[in-house]
Each structure stands twice: as C-alpha cells, then as structure tokens.
Design a protein with these regions (language model features):
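Conserved active-site and SAM-binding loop architecture
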Residues: 1-83
C-alpha cells in the first residue's frame, strides 16, 4: 500500500501509515518546519511544497525517477490534513 500525504504538517498521517505497514512515497507541505521534519523522517519520499501545482503528472514523474514505474501497481491511499 502506498501513502501520499497532503497538508502533511509534521507527518502525523505518514507516521500512522508507517504503523500500518504502508510506504509514504510523496508529501505536500508548505510550512518550512514541517518540510524539515518530513525530509528527515522520510528522506526517500518526494516532498512538494505547493498544493496548487501538485498534480498527478508531477507525482508520476518524480516517483518514477525514484522508484521506477512499479509504484503505479500498488494501491494508493491519499490523506489530507486540515489546512
């Protein structure tokens, strides 16, 4: 199971996903402090800062660079914190 976290803050949903055995592959968080936390605990994930241009195409390109096209074969869970 793949997790993508929107409005991720300091990674609460990503931590819960880890506890569930899911892999967080991408996050989107605009706050610089939250970005530092996410980069520290999920260094291999793609981290984006602006939800306005966080599109499927962007995710596909960035995740394919990191994980190859096989990431598309898993089920995807998208979570969203409150902005």
């Amino acid at each position: 199971m793949i997790h993508i976290g929107l409005f991720e803050g300091i990674g609460g949903f990503s931590l819960a996903a880890k506890w569930m055995g899911w892999k967080t592959l991408a996050t989107c968080e605009i706050n610089p402090f939250g970005q530092k936390i996410l980069n520290h605990y999920w260094p291999n994930a793609y981290h984006h800062s602006d939800i306005h241009d966080f599109t499927y195409e962007t995710i596909d390109i960035e995740l394919s660079k990191r994980f190859g096209s096989s990431w598309r074969n898993d089920d995807i869970i998208v979570t969203g914190g409150f902005p």
